[in-house]
Design a protein with these regions (language model features):
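Bacterial N-terminal signal peptides that target proteins for export
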Residues: 1-8
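Solvent-exposed, well-ordered loop and adjacent helix/strand elements within mature globular domains
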Residues: 22-130
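Hydrophobic helical h-region of N-terminal Sec-dependent signal peptides
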Residues: 9-17
Length: 130
């Protein structure tokens, strides 16, 4: 009986891990500009280079804290699918949002960016490292 419980526990954990890794999540998307108020530093300690953000070299996002519970960690690459071509593609999770936010993503954008001005919904997928 003990062996059965151990096997069952392992199977359940494997299913949970597999779900969180291969899952897709639909999130409310907004944009943010990390100006002087934050000191140009993200929550994971990365320094924001405004020129690289403007040129599209640094595609960074902030996720709501509840996404960490689903297996997303700083440095993870995520793939975005949306109706907005400027948002589609791969982004790196570098920053976190307020603890009040749930099922949300913030895209780091250059100042006065007009890629999207109204909140929208996007689907995210975690990209597994090779």
């Amino acid at each position: 009986m003990k062996k059965f419980k151990k096997v069952l526990t392992i199977l359940v954990l494997a299913l949970i891990i597999n779900y969180s890794v291969n899952a897709q999540h639909v999130l409310r998307a907004t944009k943010y500009y990390a100006g002087h108020n934050c000191g140009w530093i993200t929550a994971d300690g990365s320094r924001i280079n405004e020129t690289r953000v403007k040129n599209g070299q640094d595609r960074w996002v902030a996720l709501s804290p509840d996404m960490k519970k689903l297996g997303y960690n700083f440095g993870d690459t995520i793939r975005i699918e949306s109706d907005n071509p400027h948002l589609n593609g791969q982004w790196i999770f570098k920053d976190s949002m307020s603890s009040k936010k749930k099922k949300s993503i913030d895209f780091l954008m250059p100042r006065k960016s007009d890629y999207f001005n109204n909140p929208c919904y996007v689907t995210i997928y975690k990209v597994e490292k090779a």
